């Protein structure tokens, strides 16, 4: 079968003369109508440093597609800057943008009968949004990560944007001056690229590399380095070859690929958001990952990378130390990676890793030796209990007190919580509850980076817990539990918590318990009234109506009919 199996419906035959006339206007010649048409989903934007360097990558990829014998069609998709919208009403649109990105790529590619797609993205939701579309469409596809930002520097220390969030808490607690806060602000983000630690963007790009949907080494390259542009060119050539061979996303996005991604995420200390996104992508690919799958792999995989937010280094340091392929090779050598999983290159994971060293170099300490890990088990734990009967997600490493029981401090929004922290109203041993921030309740499941960073900045990170039906930034660490399901807006137990109730977060036992009797909870539930929707028109209203529980990925196309 020809390589233009999809696009031939608009390029071939006498009846398609009008279609070809339109294509001639955008650069097609007589010899181009039999070539495969490749969509180039370009996430370029000057909204955020994460995406501001992407257009040059798209230009390099576009030229490479032509050289490889295909016809590129570049189109734009959106981005929301999590870092800029953080702590504001705008953050409600962040997770929504994942669906908009997915829908826009699917719409453009399917509407124009494209034969394959190369997507380039940078900020957090670009990655899962693109992969959702790829899994749904099941046409040959590859993802190109825009690249990570280089660290900022101040007084001999590496900085990331999270440094600025934490500095706000330090300033409010009187631990640094306004001048020191301003200095951090000015040095935290030195140029183009996604946030530098093993936060959500770098976590998801690493996951895609592990799954075989991006090229090896591509997820940790700096955005501004020439090797990133070369990688974009190589990715384009690989995609055109995949179109020839008809290697499809669902050939790659198998259960083995998802398990490989989870193993790598655990090994590098990745973001809690990966749980939400992989659940969603697996469903789009026809698989059915559950929260229990994450817990099973967590118990087997050690954290072997010393990366921010809870560690010392950033993604560019990981790249210099051997990148994701070295992490994968170590996992493969210890039976924790499926070597027979297929990649977009047509080779298996094991074949791709054949020449990669099995152990990290002794002259670096970003990647630890297998027998000296950061932590013996993974860091993303699934907690359950009467406060989260469907489950909740917590980072359980890098905390001094894995168990806390304390009085609930209840807040109906992120803003109210942050105000209390900055005003010094939160005390050691308190358990903060931020509710009505879930997928439906927010709507949009905002990330709580501002409150958690304020807690860290105030010196309370080891003594205060925080639970929420919202999410956390990949930059968050401490005794924090998110994705609590069922959420407050649908009557989950978190909606029934009252000020002063005793709550236990037990990371080791993976328990999240509200110390209130079943009878008392029943009586509270009978009195509970579901809040009216905050929005009755527009994208947030549509999202709140359609979105599912976070325990199944907060998708918008679950059980529609």
UniProtKB/Swiss-Prot annotation:
Key word Glycoprotein present: no
Residue positions, PTM N6-carboxylysine: 125
Lyase in keyword set: yes
Keywords: 2Fe-2S, Amino-acid biosynthesis, Branched-chain amino acid biosynthesis, Iron, Iron-sulfur, Lyase, Magnesium, Metal-binding
Catalytic activity: (2R)-2,3-dihydroxy-3-methylbutanoate = 3-methyl-2-oxobutanoate + H2O; (2R,3R)-2,3-dihydroxy-3-methylpentanoate = (S)-3-methyl-2-oxopentanoate + H2O
GO molecular function ontology, one term from the record: 2 iron, 2 sulfur cluster binding
GO BP terms, alphabetized: isoleucine biosynthetic process; L-valine biosynthetic process
Obligatory cofactor(s): [2Fe-2S] cluster; Mg(2+)
Enzyme class label: lyase
Pathway given in the UniProt record: Amino-acid biosynthesis; L-isoleucine biosynthesis; L-isoleucine from 2-oxobutanoate: step 3/4; Amino-acid biosynthesis; L-valine biosynthesis; L-valine from pyruvate: step 3/4
Binding-site list for [2Fe-2S] cluster: 50, 123, 195
Highest rank taxon of the organism: Bacteria
SUPFAM superfamilies, per database record: IlvD/EDD N-terminal domain-like, LeuD/IlvD-like
Assigned EC number: 4.2.1.9
Residues annotated as catalytic: 473
Entry-linked Pfam families: ILV_EDD_C, ILVD_EDD_N
InterPro entries: DHAD_IlvD/Edd, Dihydro-acid_dehy_C, DihydroxyA_deHydtase, DiOHA_6PGluconate_deHydtase_CS, ILV_EDD_C, ILV_EDD_N, IlvD/EDD_N
Residues binding Mg(2+), per UniProt: 82, 124-125, 447
Cofactor descriptive note: Binds 1 [2Fe-2S] cluster per subunit. This cluster acts as a Lewis acid cofactor.
Protein function: Functions in the biosynthesis of branched-chain amino acids. Catalyzes the dehydration of (2R,3R)-2,3-dihydroxy-3-methylpentanoate (2,3-dihydroxy-3-methylvalerate) into 2-oxo-3-methylpentanoate (2-oxo-3-methylvalerate) and of (2R)-2,3-dihydroxy-3-methylbutanoate (2,3-dihydroxyisovalerate) into 2-oxo-3-methylbutanoate (2-oxoisovalerate), the penultimate precursor to L-isoleucine and L-valine, respectively.
Quaternary structure note: Homodimer.
Family per similarity comment: Belongs to the IlvD/Edd family.
Name of the protein in its database record: Dihydroxy-acid dehydratase
Organism listed in the record: Acaryochloris marina (strain MBIC 11017)
Lineage, opening ranks: Bacteria, Bacillati, Cyanobacteriota, Cyanophyceae, Acaryochloridales
């Amino acid at each position: 079968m020809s390589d233009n199996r999809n696009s031939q419906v608009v390029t071939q035959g006498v009846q398609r003369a009008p279609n070809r006339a339109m294509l001639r206007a955008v650069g097609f010649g007589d010899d181009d109508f039999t070539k495969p048409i490749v969509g180039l989903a370009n996430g370029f934007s000057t909204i955020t440093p994460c995406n501001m360097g992407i257009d040059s990558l798209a230009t390099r990829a576009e030229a490479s597609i032509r050289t490889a014998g295909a016809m590129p069609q570049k189109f734009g998709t959106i981005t929301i800057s999590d870092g800029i919208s953080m702590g504001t009403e705008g953050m409600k649109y962040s997770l929504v943008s994942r669906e908009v990105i997915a829908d826009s790529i699917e719409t453009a590619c399917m509407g124009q009968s494209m034969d394959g797609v190369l997507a380039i993205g940078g900020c957090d939701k670009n990655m899962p949004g693109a992969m959702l579309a790829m899994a749904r469409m099941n046409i040959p596809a590859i993802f190109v990560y825009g690249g990570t930002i280089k660290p900022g520097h101040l007084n001999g220390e590496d900085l990331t944007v999270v440094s600025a969030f934490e500095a706000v808490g330090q300033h409010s607690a009187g631990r640094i001056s306004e001048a020191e806060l301003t200095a951090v602000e000015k040095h935290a983000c030195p140029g183009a690229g996604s946030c530098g630690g093993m936060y959500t963007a770098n976590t998801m790009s690493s996951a895609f590399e592990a799954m075989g949907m991006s090229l090896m080494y591509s997820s940790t390259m700096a955005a501004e380095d020439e090797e990133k542009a070369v990688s974009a060119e190589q990715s384009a050539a690989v995609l055109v070859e995949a179109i020839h061979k008809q290697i499809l996303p669902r050939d790659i996005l198998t259960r083995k690929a998802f398990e490989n991604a989870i193993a790598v995420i655990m090994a590098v200390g990745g973001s809690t958001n990966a749980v939400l996104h992989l659940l969603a992508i697996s469903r789009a690919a026809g698989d059915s990952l559950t929260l229990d799958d994450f817990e099973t792999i967590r118990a087997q995989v050690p954290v072997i990378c010393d990366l921010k937010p809870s560690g010392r280094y950033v993604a560019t340091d990981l790249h210099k130390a051997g990148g994701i392929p070295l992490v994968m090779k170590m996992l493969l050598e210890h039976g924790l990676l499926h070597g027979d999983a297929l990649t977009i290159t047509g080779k298996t994971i094991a074949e791709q890793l054949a020449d990669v060293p099995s152990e990290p170099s002794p002259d670096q300490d970003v990647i630890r030796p297998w027998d000296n890990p950061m932590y013996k088990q993974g860091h993303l734990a699934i907690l359950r209990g009467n406060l989260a009967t469907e489950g909740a997600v917590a980072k359980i490493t890098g905390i001094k007190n894995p168990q806390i029981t304390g009085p609930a401090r209840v807040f109906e929004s992120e803003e109210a919580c942050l105000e209390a922290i900055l005003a010094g109203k939160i005390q050691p041993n308190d358990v903060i509850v931020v509710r009505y921030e879930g997928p439906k309740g927010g709507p949009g499941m905002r990330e709580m980076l501002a409150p958690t960073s304020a807690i860290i900045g105030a010196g309370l990170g080891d003594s205060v817990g925080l639970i929420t039906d919202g999410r956390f930034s990949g930059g968050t660490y401490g005794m924090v539990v998110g994705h609590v399901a069922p959420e407050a807006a649908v009557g989950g137990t978190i909606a029934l918590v009252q000020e002063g109730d005793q709550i236990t977060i037990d990371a080791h036992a993976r328990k999240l318990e509200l110390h209130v009797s079943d009878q008392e909870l029943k009586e509270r539930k009978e009195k509970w009234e579901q809040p009216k929707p905050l929005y009755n028109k527009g994208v947030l209203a549509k999202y709140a109506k359609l979105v599912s529980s976070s325990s199944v990925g907060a998708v918008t196309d679950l059980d529609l009919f």
